[in-house]
């Protein structure tokens, strides 16, 4: 949770352990899952990230060297330098890559990716300057 909360600045909006037929729905090995909803309570229209954990789940697959087919990352608008510094201070530096992309009106947009501890690739998109 430190990666998502302390590093990326999300607030835990709601957390609960749900009981259901998760083996049928997800192919899980348990009927219990832990669900945590993260977001910004001051800006609820910016979206919510749900983290789901199953007890006894298999280890995460290795992160591939390149993009996977289909959805492969979570993209967030954040100050790139500040966010990467906050994550590094917490010990999170896996998979960091940075670029700058040309934008309209002669501006540039800083971008970076970092791999979360659970293997999710997170893209950071900074403001155009």
Question: Where do the protein language model's features map onto the residues?
Answer:
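Core segments of cupin and vicinal oxygen chelate
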Residues: 1-45, 82, 105-107
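Short, structured motif recognition centered on aromatic/hydrophobic residues
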Residues: 4, 46-51, 71, 122-124
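Short glycine-biased active-site loop of nucleotidyltransferases that positions the nucleotide triphosphate
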Residues: 26-30, 63-64, 113
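Short, charged/polar, Gly/Pro-enriched secondary-structure boundary elements
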Residues: 44-46, 59-60, 119-120
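Eukaryotic phosphotyrosine signaling hubs
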Residues: 67-73
């Amino acid at each position: 949770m430190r990666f998502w909360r302390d590093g990326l600045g999300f607030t835990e909006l709601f957390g609960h352990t749900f009981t259901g037929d998760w083996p049928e729905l997800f192919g899980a090995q348990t009927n219990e899952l832990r669900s945590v909803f993260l977001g910004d309570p001051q800006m609820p229209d910016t979206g919510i990230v749900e983290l789901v954990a199953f007890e006894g789940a298999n280890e995460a697959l290795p992160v591939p060297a390149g993009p996977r087919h289909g959805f492969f990352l979570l993209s967030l608008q954040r100050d790139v330098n500040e966010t990467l510094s906050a994550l590094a201070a917490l010990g999170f530096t896996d998979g960091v890559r940075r670029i700058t992309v040309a934008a309209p009106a002669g501006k540039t947009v800083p971008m970076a990716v970092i791999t979360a501890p659970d293997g999710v690739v997170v893209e950071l998109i900074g403001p155009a300057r």
